[in-house]
């Protein structure tokens, strides 16, 4: 895939990632990848003031969320099905920047992320490699959070362990200004586009998961399926629809 490549400094590890995901320099591309010392960052060449995007499992936001974890306040704990010593295996079929997958792994679940876009996959792989080396989280992150580069619609064909839970957070259209995400995430959406196959992805997920499928939706959005939603958990801005497998 073609993208503008900018090197702030040479990094052998990141150069290997660029080769692995076949990312090649394109002088005319409006999106760029910045090799910023020890991290890979996506940035908007048309807006140099916009903050670059990177996957950082050691961020202050993640640290705060983990440090202040309370069962009743963490919605992913409530929808996951975790009970006592039971920690379900989770397949995140819409990995994005890996934020929710990281929380599932922090909670004790073994998580596999699937991502088909080579640029996003490179960002995730970079974040994982740095996270694995972190002194605070690396010891458990290495055993709980992993990435598969593939199309989620083909996950029935992937020879992986059948997960207990499949998690879906598909992109959805925004109908009014107040519902728009931050500018950096709007830019990220431009890269990966909308998920026009979300309903089909839910159908595939219900054929694979053992126990449940969790679909994250905005509070105003219609369910992905006309079938009955078995359970619903709501927050201020989102709704988590839980379906049973076929």
UniProtKB/Swiss-Prot annotation:
Reactions this protein catalyses: guanosine(1516) in 16S rRNA + S-adenosyl-L-methionine = N(2)-methylguanosine(1516) in 16S rRNA + S-adenosyl-L-homocysteine + H(+)
Subcellular location(s): the record lists: Cytoplasm
Cystine bridges: which residues?
Answer: none
- Subcellular location, principal: cytoplasm
Q: Which domain of life is it from?
A: Bacteria
Signal peptide position in this chain? none
Alphabetized GO MF terms: rRNA (guanine-N2-)-methyltransferase activity
What InterPro entries has UniProt attached to this entry? 16SrRNA_methylTrfase_J (IPR007536), SAM-dependent_MTases_sf (IPR029063)
List the EC numbers from the record: 2.1.1.242
Protein residues bound to S-adenosyl-L-methionine: 115-116, 169
So what family is this one in?
Belongs to the methyltransferase superfamily. RsmJ family.
Q: Under which name does UniProt file this protein?
A: Ribosomal RNA small subunit methyltransferase J
Source organism of this protein record: Buchnera aphidicola subsp. Acyrthosiphon pisum (strain 5A)
